[in-house]
Amino acid sequence: MKIILVDAVFCFVSDKGQIFKEMHILLETYINKKIILTGANDEQFKTFGLDKIPYEVFTLKHNPEKTDPKYYEMMLEHFNLDKNDVIYFEHNIDAVKSAQSVGINTYFYDDSKKYLGELKKFLDENI
């Protein structure tokens, strides 16, 4: 069963630390494990409310950033996962390209639209 990797800020939570309720409801329809990915440092972790969300959170504290393929290589190694074990959605197009460059099936989520229909389709087709 594939693990769903979720971009933290602007996908699952706002920059004010509010959980995007509709996103949470959508994710809860899947029994798959979810891991929230972020680059947040300790201060940002609290600011964004990442210490209060219902899923495991992975961060490398901006070293490297998610726009660097090394971030995803290190994340996969940390969890002892293969690129084929996961699917991912992310709001930053450069981070999307970075994840794709290491072979992770990744969806660009346009956080300005907050439209979940296409994301649900991606999840349904790739889990």
Question: How does the language model describe each region?
Answer:
Residues 1-5, 85, 125-126:
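Non-catalytic pre-domain segments flanking phosphatase-related domains
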Residues 30, 51-53, 102-104:
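Short, structured coil segments at secondary-structure junctions
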Residues 32-35, 83-86, 105:
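Short active-site oxyanion
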Residues 42-84:
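Substrate-recognition "cap/lid" segment bordering the active-site pocket of phosphatases
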Residues 73-78, 118-127:
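Short amphipathic alpha-helix with an adjacent loop that forms part of the alpha/beta core around
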Residues 87-120:
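Acidic, Mg2+-coordinating phosphoryl-transfer loop and its flanking beta/alpha structural elements
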